[in-house]
């Protein structure tokens, strides 16, 4: 019976791990699906303005929009500046 218990408990652990991973994936997809239609263009325009004044690669700039409440959104801009 111990052998059977070992395999059954492992399946539960594997199922829990798979469930947690799926929840992370779904949360990430929801995060990007909730973006307004104008957001990709906003990202491109912000990047072009920054590149006008500072010589940086596009992957050095991240723009995120977080919805805190129904009426509050936070635009977060992170830029890695060269030395």
From Swiss-Prot:
Pfam families, alphabetically? Answer: MinE (PF03776)
An example Gene Ontology biological process = regulation of division septum assembly
> Keywords in UniProt for this one?
Cell cycle, Cell division
Q: Which InterPro entries match?
A: MinE (IPR005527), MinE_sf (IPR036707)
Tell me which family the UniProt entry assigns to this protein.
Belongs to the MinE family.
* Protein function: Prevents the cell division inhibition by proteins MinC and MinD at internal division sites while permitting inhibition at polar sites. This ensures cell division at the proper site by restricting the formation of a division septum at the midpoint of the long axis of the cell.
| Protein name, UniProt field | Cell division topological specificity factor
Gene encoding this chain? minE
